[in-house]
Amino acid sequence: MKVDELPIDERIKRVIKERGIEELYPPQAEALKSGVLEGKNLVLAIPTASGKTLVSEIVMVNKLLSEGGKAVYLVPLKALAEEKYREFKEWEVLGLRVAATTGDYDSTDEWLGRYDIIVATAEKFDSLLRHGASWIKDVKLVVADEVHLIGSYDRGATLEMILTHMLGKAQILALSATVGNAEELAEWLDASLVVSDWRPVELRKGVFHLGQLFWEDGKIDHYPENWESLVLDAVKKGKQALVFVNTRRSAEKEAISLSSKVSKLLTKPETRRLEELISSIEDNPTTEKLKRALKGGVAFHHAGLSRAERTLIEDAFRNGLIKVITATPTLCMHPDTYVVTKSGAKKVSELTEGDEVLTHTGTFKKVIQPLRREHKGRLLVIKAYGTVPVKITPEHMVWVVKQIRHKSHYSDGRQVIWWEFEGPEWMTAQELKERLESETDPKVSYMLLQPIPEPSVDADKIPLRKEVYVVNQHGKTDKLHPSVKRTPEYLPLNFETARLIGLWIAEGSTSKNGVIKFDISSNEEDLTEFITGTIRKYFPHAKIVVKDHERNRRTVRFCNKRFAEWLRENIGHGADNKSIPPLLLLNKNREVRLGLLRGLIEGDGYVRRESQRRANYISYSTVSPSLAYQLQLLVASLGYTSSIHRSIRTEGIGKTRKPIYDVKVSGKSYYSLLEELGFEVPQRGNRTYNVNRTWKNYLLLKVRSIEEEEYEGDVYNLEVEGDESYSVGFIVHNSAGINLPAFRVIIRDTKRYANFGWTDIPVLEIQQMMGRAGRPKYDKVGEAIIVARTEDPKKLIDRYIHGKPEKLFSMLANEQAFRSQVLALITNFGVEDFRELVDFLSRTFYAHQRGDTSSLEYKAKDIVYFLIENEFIDMDVENRFIALPFGRRTSQLYIDPLTAKKFKDAFPAIERNPNPFGIFQLLASTPDMATLTARRREMEDYLDLAYEMEEHLYSSIPYYEDSRFQGFLGQVKTAKVLLDWINEVPEARIYETYNIDPGDLYRILELADWLMYSLIELYKLFEPKEDVLQYLRDLHLRLRHGVREELLELVKLPNIGRRRARALYNAGFRSVEDILRAKPKDLLQVEGIGLKIIEGIYRHLGVEYTISEKEKPKKRKGNLYDFLK
């Protein structure tokens, strides 16, 4: 389609043609014919560099010129906002005004009301929606760039909520990379869909292996064996190359290595221009490496560089001065293997995106995608005491601790046994097998680790009141169920009620009409008395029916429709489908967990007490593997050890029952647990030995054997968000940036290391990297090459070149993001009650994709209870929400409610002892802060620092065994960085001392600045003490500028930062008054102070002062080298 044929304003055509564009690309033409120019929503999913931005510009400008109003262009990153702002400024020739906004989440930015095109990050626009900026009602179009990030764990929920808010209020144009389910996104947005793989530059894709380049069309080119030859070949052709690697250090190392080779291909003018570029970069440890690489026309690009440095590199690459950039882009199980998830154990082959699995940290993380491949050959069967055997591929890694048993004898005859531990470390299953078989020392054992989740659910009741109706043979009627009016609003959670629920899990069932039944033995009078007494206590209006049956069976029944529904929805129905909900399993109240365990044991357990010679034990049998794994975690959360045994019992010839899972507690745990649960405790026997024990926050499982087994079929793995591990009864590994085009893209790595090992990079990411190949206007063809170092080239071609990208999945259920969004809906968007909240959630992508919001509703209820309990919101007598000042301000400040709660809880301690270190550790402890990691060799130093500063902290130091211990030391390290910063420690020394890059420090300071501001704003709500408030304000100013207290007055002056302020202070200019009294020529003697700085200060202070020619500094004369340079 020709530009002249477009049904748009002629002025727009003129601007486009001035860019040299006379004809549109095919996908652009298809997009503009889709109805988007008439106001219809559109999802445009096409490759990088195929013209998505031009489509959005045409739609935006045409709509604004014809209808008025405003257009908002959403981007994921601040750097992209700046880039788009510069691009869109061109439209100001048509009278449109363009603005960009990315920071300061505590503002309505009313000044944006004067602008027509507003570029914003998603987070910034979300904050503007919360503040209720008056100009938002005028927004006629929202463009969501990179909308595929709706599947991002960290940022996806924000983007999804924005689009849900704006659906029906403004036209939506969603720009996306090619994804696996774009049609699903289009359906949700009620949008036309244009999907295309057309590119303006032909893309050749291939895999390089040991000097052979296998193209996707079957052709083979030959090069020297090292992949670097691909880079040099591109430069020799007068082209540029992008090299993607998997770590920052690799990017730096490869850039320096390539520099010495590429430098020989540069011209002398290029060398001189590179020297000028190098001289403009500030010195620090990271840029020292960058300068070494730049000498040869090569640069590295990663998040450790400052924004200014990244921009400088990108501009020099676009201009052709930099030839090469190395950059970082931002194994398997048998199908019947059970993985521990938040809702119980599930087969790895049955897991789906969004399931939450237990990771090595003891927390549950989202599954991004399940992975599957064919396998023919060996599997290793790992058998460990305390868990069921697991079948695993030999190269799959497991987390292992080496345990060494020691024995000491004393003169009085006493014998003490103790253990030493080495690790943990990752090793392949094959390596573990070889170590196990070669180990000759009987004192050495190899232990697998099962994390013990920290109880994290703070709930003391179960909500019961709800409108439920009678169900008859024709379905639901409008007749309210009679039990509802007599149902208590909540069922308290305590030892008694948890015990009752435990009994129901073991021996209970429900009917659709609300009958709750317990099946017990007819000789269990004490149990009958407990069940009936507890029902009478908490359901006083319920009719209880006790009936004996043959074979010594007894049923206890009562009716409560709401409680029955809660049991079915949260626990399940049927012996093999039941699981323990997190509300109980992870409840912070130990009494709740103890009551639950007692009820389970009473219902379906067995306590062996009669033997003195043989080991006694507590046993629980179930056909539900999910329940078995959860029971082991429940026992472990109480500080005891247990084991799981699986057996298959047969009856008759050829008849096989389902596997039975027995969870056993024996040894010392047996006696202690019986006593704590309130059972009769027998006399201790001679045998209390147990091979398993707890260590730190893990259950240690001793490996007893590893056997081989032949297998042919599919094997599975998981990609986990923010982690590289998951639990199958013990921890296994899941073995599973830059926006510039270049002629040749080389992908050195298709795996990356995160936390504890390697994982395959998703297809979508690799294909986006490949999409950078080929520069429109400059190249007729682009080349994208994957390097196969140890991988099979054919498999890489099948996966990454011919494979389809992954599907997008809603990340709204991410608890941290969802918590903040629920608060915002209530306090800022006028959601009046829970029904309205559910109604809004039903319009989200999550609801559209899953067709059901029940799990989201359950989470929302938990969050609402949390918000009420912590005084963010309240409810009136009609169950309508009331937004409280604390909640409204928290939402406006754009921080997690958990962060706000931490601040509020700390206010009394801050008033007693305001100090920088305690406040900085508080900031670092919040979920909104990016904290540093304390490496193993540093842990002792930071623990010593914590004890030294203990009286200044606002929280206690966790024990070594506590799962929070390592994270706490990271918080201490982060607080120490901030303390050094405000004490004017030079940046270079901070980078070196803490082994961080400038980009890391910038990110920490930016977040700390915002959190410090939020702390002050929230403190104002709670009758603040003026002296404490002033202290916090001064500390905030010190944090923002990185200065000691004596420089506060100076840094308030324009363009006076930490270095210039210190230079002025040391030169004797210690206050504004000193500066006003000084002569300009004296100020000009201070390092870093120039004429423009002085003039700016005078203007700021309202002083009219003209600097004479004599007072102006004389220009320094240069030499010949300066002139030539």
From Swiss-Prot:
A motif (DEAH box) lies at residues 145-148. The keyword DNA damage applies. Residues 500-640 form the DOD-type homing endonuclease domain. Disruption phenotype: Not essential, it can be disrupted. Slightly more sensitive to UV and mitomycin C than wild-type cells. This is ATP-dependent DNA helicase Hel308. Belongs to the helicase family. Hel308 subfamily. HAMAP family: Helicase_Hel308. Keywords: ATP-binding, Autocatalytic cleavage, DNA damage, DNA repair, DNA-binding, Endonuclease, Helicase, Hydrolase, Intron homing, Isomerase, Nuclease, Nucleotide-binding, Protein splicing. SUPFAM superfamilies: Hedgehog/intein (Hint) domain, Homing endonucleases, P-loop containing nucleoside triphosphate hydrolases, Sec63 N-terminal domain-like, Winged helix' DNA-binding domain. Pfam families: DEAD, Helicase_dom4_arc, HHH_5, LAGLIDADG_3. PANTHER family: ATP-DEPENDENT DNA HELICASE HEL308, DNA POLYMERASE THETA, PUTATIVE (AFU_ORTHOLOGUE AFUA_1G05260)-RELATED. InterPro entries: DEAD/DEAH_box_helicase_dom (IPR011545), Hel308-like_dom4 (IPR048772), Hel308_SKI2-like (IPR050474), Helicase_ATP-bd (IPR014001), Helicase_Hel308 (IPR022965), Hint_dom_C (IPR003586), Hint_dom_sf (IPR036844), Hlx-hairpin-Hlx_DNA-bd_motif (IPR003583). GO terms for molecular function: 3'-5' DNA helicase activity; ATP binding; ATP hydrolysis activity; DNA binding; endonuclease activity. It comes from Thermococcus kodakarensis (strain ATCC BAA-918 / JCM 12380 / KOD1). It catalyses: Couples ATP hydrolysis with the unwinding of duplex DNA by translocating in the 3'-5' direction; ATP + H2O = ADP + phosphate + H(+). DNA-dependent ATPase and 3'-5' DNA helicase that may be involved in repair of stalled replication forks. It comes from the Archaea. ATP binds at Q28, I46, P47, T48, A49, S50, G51, K52, T53. The gene is hel308. The lineage of its organism: Archaea, Methanobacteriati, Methanobacteriota, Thermococci, Thermococcales. Its EC number is 5.6.2.4, 3.1.-.-. The keyword Chloroplast does not apply. One of its GO terms (biological process) is intein-mediated protein splicing. Residues 33-197 form the Helicase ATP-binding domain. A motif (Q motif) lies at residues 1-29. This protein undergoes a protein self splicing that involves a post-translational excision of the intervening region (intein) followed by peptide ligation. Monomer. Residues 226-440 form the Helicase C-terminal domain.
